[in-house]
Amino acid sequence: MTKNFLDPQLAKAVSGEEERQRHNIELVASENFVSKAVRQAQGSVLTNKYSEGYPGKRYYGGNEYIDIAENLAIERAKELFGVSYANVQPHSGSSANFEAYMAFLHPGDKILGMNLDSGGHLTHGASVSFSGKMYEAQSYKVDSETELLDYDAILKQAKEFKPNLIIAGASAYSRTIDFQAFRDIADEVNAYLMVDIAHIAGLIAAGLHPSPVGLADIITTTTHKTLRGPCGGMILADEKYAKRINSAVFPGSQGGPLDHVVAAKAAAFYEDLQPDFKTYSAQIIKNAKTMADAFSKEPDVRVVSGGTDNHMFTLDLTKTGLNGRQVQDLLDSVSITLNREALPNEKRSPFVTSGVRIGTPAMTTKGLKENEMLQIEHLIMRAIHAHDDKNELTKIKRDVFDLMDKFPFDSNPF
């Protein structure tokens, strides 16, 4: 394996992470396990090449094979989402969002995106992000009672604020997003509509969540999460916007693309186009619903909005007496990985929070199904109830290892 060529200190870190991924229950909603093909592409000699520009129009020679790989990624992305244009060069989802803003806005323009506490992303207008520093930003929130998007309230806010760009999409919203409603709001105030599908891209590609294609002016996404590709970004749009988006990516904000990552995107998109990807994506949702339903029956925790329509949900921990950071650390100690998450109208710091976010893409990739989701829910509640009982926590960690030993690291059934 590659680690045999590494120096001892780095080899220890890599092998340690491999063991962690082998034995842990992975519930971080933004993580997944890529295939050997994706890892092979990302670890290939394409990392040696530099290729500023686009296929057929590079600023360096010797890019004939890089062009083939990038064109494969582009064409597969277009087929996957049914779009006429795709840019696969963004280094990350945040990069893609920055480049989308550059393509459609000027510094100081107004943007309207989802509030962080409601499940939005930093790059949707948070004050600590470039999006809140370069642009005049406001945030819309979920309804305080239902914890769902209130499209009438968003329309009212948009009419008052008059944004140049409205952002739909989230990083911790478990319900179906009505992109047609957002299109109608954008049209009402003469704004561009950007949709960030980073979390639900795989579900959209599989036809299991409504698509923003044909409604959004520009679509951004990551290529990992539910797409099960390498960490990276991508922009989708109508061909009429190609020139302005291409210019915003290069030379507007990036130099050369990461050619090995672009090739890994192509490998992942090939897998996503296979019939079993829909089966896999459907199982992600089944698993999330099963676990959310089980948590909903527990007296000490509450599922935000009452459930999920996608791959993730947020747990309100208020009644447990523990905060999000404490539960994240507690579960880390028994080899269950997730992340602390703010609740709607959160009172605590983002470093603490009152909730945790749970996602099922990674465990679904390993082959776990509904029965295992019930076991995981039980393990989490056992840990919360035994948070100060070291002997019980040791038993829980052993049970986690026993469960994951049934699902080897490279046994991806999909």
Curated annotation (Swiss-Prot):
- Quote the record's binding site residues for (6S)-5,6,7,8-tetrahydrofolate: 116, 120-122, 349-351
Q: What is its main location?
A: cytoplasm
Catalytic activity reported: (6R)-5,10-methylene-5,6,7,8-tetrahydrofolate + glycine + H2O = (6S)-5,6,7,8-tetrahydrofolate + L-serine
- For this UniProt record, give its keywords in alphabetical order, as a comma-separated list: Amino-acid biosynthesis, Cytoplasm, One-carbon metabolism, Pyridoxal phosphate, Transferase
**Biological pathway:** One-carbon metabolism; tetrahydrofolate interconversion; Amino-acid biosynthesis; glycine biosynthesis; glycine from L-serine: step 1/1
- Where would you find this protein in the cell? Cytoplasm
Q: Does the keyword Protein biosynthesis apply?
A: no
Site Plays an important role in substrate specificity: list residues.
224
Subunit description: Homodimer.
Outline what the protein does: Catalyzes the reversible interconversion of serine and glycine with tetrahydrofolate (THF) serving as the one-carbon carrier. This reaction serves as the major source of one-carbon groups required for the biosynthesis of purines, thymidylate, methionine, and other important biomolecules. Also exhibits THF-independent aldolase activity toward beta-hydroxyamino acids, producing glycine and aldehydes, via a retro-aldol mechanism.
Recorded protein name is: Serine hydroxymethyltransferase
Q: Which organism is it from?
A: Oenococcus oeni (strain ATCC BAA-331 / PSU-1)
Highest lineage ranks of the organism?
A: Bacteria, Bacillati, Bacillota, Bacilli, Lactobacillales
